Amino acid sequence: MKTVVFAYHDMGCLGIEALLAAGYEISAIFTHTDNPGEKAFYGSVARLAAERGIPVYAPDNVNHPLWVERIAQLSPDVIFSFYYRHLIYDEILQLAPAGAFNLHGSLLPKYRGRAPLNWVLVNGETETGVTLHRMVKRADAGAIVAQLRIAIAPDDIAITLHHKLCHAARQLLEQTLPAIKHGNILEIAQRENEATCFGRRTPDDSFLEWHKPASVLHNMVRAVADPWPGAFSYVGNQKFTVWSSRVHPHASKAQPGSVISVAPLLIACGDGALEIVTGQAGDGITMQGSQLAQTLGLVQGSRLNSQPACTARRRTRVLILGVNGFIGNHLTERLLREDHYEVYGLDIGSDAISRFLNHPHFHFVEGDISIHSEWIEYHVKKCDVVLPLVAIATPIEYTRNPLRVFELDFEENLRIIRYCVKYRKRIIFPSTSEVYGMCSDKYFDEDHSNLIVGPVNKPRWIYSVSKQLLDRVIWAYGEKEGLQFTLFRPFNWMGPRLDNLNAARIGSSRAITQLILNLVEGSPIKLIDGGKQKRCFTDIRDGIEALYRIIENAGNRCDGEIINIGNPENEASIEELGEMLLASFEKHPLRHHFPPFAGFRVVESSSYYGKGYQDVEHRKPSIRNAHRCLDWEPKIDMQETIDETLDFFLRTVDLTDKPS
């Protein structure tokens, strides 16, 4: 049986050996080049392949059409993946008639994603295992073919658990590979309601937060002990690594992070105390705890900190252009809720952010981005993170003012992007679900879906292509000049302060605000082309939480990523949105102040939006990148969002002239 193998690490080596022992013919092996910044304690797949006389490759992008074609020419019967670090696209998986199978180091559906070995230790699990599962488009989600459980002992650390997993993997493959070869396997679908997903870990994720319980910190030490980079802390600005530890149920009133004693080296935690058994100061040598205390100059009562003292006091500076807009003002509120952000904002108005103007960590200037270029360049240079949220994003303007849309949405934003490149600043750029255009995929996927728009004589697409071209420019700057970026694509976010009723009066608003205006004024709700177009509506609170996590960027997992932020469960047509809104309106305590409902009216899109408009029938996001990078999923039901949005706008209406 011919196979193509994707493999890396010790698991890759043992997987290859198991395939050969089971009589598989390996046509080619795809692996990775070693990362010079990573301690290579594991076997080399490339070396093993060379010794076995098997062609081996390490392309940067195995999913490139050229590599897909080369793999197709190998005509594999089956494909195997053993700890290959990149997602293998469906175009490759479909090449093998018998399917594709992946070896994963956890008891799926638990601990999907990256670094399950480390995560189970971080989380204090007592059991894990290995799973062989069928590969599908979604990572680690295919049916389970075989699974083997192993116990995690209290004294297990990352390397001992790694050895246990390797031993279990050998057993599992020896038992299962012959069955796959003969087409005699039983597959069990994963239970999605039990699934958990974790992202990649970096060395910076392993800092010791002393306010946490000692048991939690001890688990962190176990999870990243040598040969992993190690858990760490600071004495002032001096970094040190903790290689091994013990939990002490020490009842102390000392502040977390305080040194209780130096021999043994005991540190007060949020609950109990942690004994540092062995550690290392800076890039020095490993030593036992009391010697480490002496080297670091620690005495009883000394304080440790989770980050260097010189950086602990500095807040992250976030520049929000368009801070008074729907996303900008809600994001400002979320950032100021924390104590480690300083927000700088620019906009042409301040009505939505007036509640922040006296906040000590909020700095606002009223101005236009097309005029205040010097202020913007200075603040891009000054700040750490830049969010250029200024854009014309209302559909009627795409046909009414296409050149103004291009000038503001593309030209002005391109200038800001170039400032970020010039000063090497991180940019979080608001792409849009509009870039997918008339894509026919069931779920719009950031990495696979085609971006399809209409002909040039349909100016409705100028917003979509302006945003798409900026996405491509940012991506190119990231590839060629090292720009640190994340692109996020909101899918129909809605909530309080989405546009305003005055904007709706001239047609320059999003759907729900326009519908609320119709109810307030007693005018018919207009259903464009029947209102059958479906959208996935996302509560602003869910959207902002995802955006906040992008800004936090735990483990740098968001760098270079495109992330859809939407709620695929909240799919409804515009007609259904109108009906839900009407039902909420009729039950509202202020209902008697407003005119009778004037009904629904079907109108043609050309009469409403003007010549050159095209609509999209459906727009449903894949949110796998949001799961993977942010550990995020939307939680708020569409009805709750409708109720709160309606209530907000009704309470902004001057009721003095309304009937009672």
UniProtKB/Swiss-Prot annotation:
It catalyses: UDP-alpha-D-glucuronate + NAD(+) = UDP-beta-L-threo-pentopyranos-4-ulose + CO2 + NADH; UDP-4-amino-4-deoxy-beta-L-arabinose + (6R)-10-formyltetrahydrofolate = UDP-4-deoxy-4-formamido-beta-L-arabinose + (6S)-5,6,7,8-tetrahydrofolate + H(+). Pathway: Nucleotide-sugar biosynthesis; UDP-4-deoxy-4-formamido-beta-L-arabinose biosynthesis; UDP-4-deoxy-4-formamido-beta-L-arabinose from UDP-alpha-D-glucuronate: step 1/3; Nucleotide-sugar biosynthesis; UDP-4-deoxy-4-formamido-beta-L-arabinose biosynthesis; UDP-4-deoxy-4-formamido-beta-L-arabinose from UDP-alpha-D-glucuronate: step 3/3; Bacterial outer membrane biogenesis; lipopolysaccharide biosynthesis. The keyword Glycoprotein does not apply. Disulfide bonds: none annotated. NAD(+) binds at D347, D368, I369. UDP-alpha-D-glucuronate binds at residues 393, 398, 432-433, 460, 492, 526-535, 613. Induction: Induced by BasR. InterPro entries: Arna-like_SDR_e (IPR045869), Bifun_polymyxin_resist_ArnA (IPR021168), Epimerase_deHydtase (IPR001509), Formyl_trans_C (IPR005793), Formyl_transf_N (IPR002376), Formyl_transf_N_sf (IPR036477), Formyl_transferase-like_C_sf (IPR011034), Lipid_A_modif_metabolic_enz (IPR050177). Changing S433A: 40-fold lower specific activity. Residues 314-660 are annotated as: Dehydrogenase ArnADH. Transmembrane segments: none annotated. Keywords: Antibiotic resistance, Lipid A biosynthesis, Lipid biosynthesis, Lipid metabolism, Lipopolysaccharide biosynthesis, Multifunctional enzyme, NAD, Oxidoreductase, Transferase. Coiled coil: none annotated. Pfam families: Epimerase, Formyl_trans_C, Formyl_trans_N. Residues 1-304 are annotated as: Formyltransferase ArnAFT. The active site is at H104, E434, R619. The record marks D140 as: Raises pKa of active site His. GO terms for molecular function: identical protein binding; NAD+ binding; UDP-4-amino-4-deoxy-L-arabinose formyltransferase activity; UDP-glucuronate decarboxylase activity; UDP-glucuronate dehydrogenase activity. (6R)-10-formyltetrahydrofolate binds at H86, L87, I88, R114, V136, K137, R138, A139, D140. GO terms for cellular component: membrane; protein-containing complex. HAMAP family: ArnA. Homohexamer, formed by a dimer of trimers. Bifunctional enzyme that catalyzes the oxidative decarboxylation of UDP-glucuronic acid (UDP-GlcUA) to UDP-4-keto-arabinose (UDP-Ara4O) and the addition of a formyl group to UDP-4-amino-4-deoxy-L-arabinose (UDP-L-Ara4N) to form UDP-L-4-formamido-arabinose (UDP-L-Ara4FN). The modified arabinose is attached to lipid A and is required for resistance to polymyxin and cationic antimicrobial peptides. This is Bifunctional polymyxin resistance protein ArnA. It comes from Escherichia coli (strain K12).
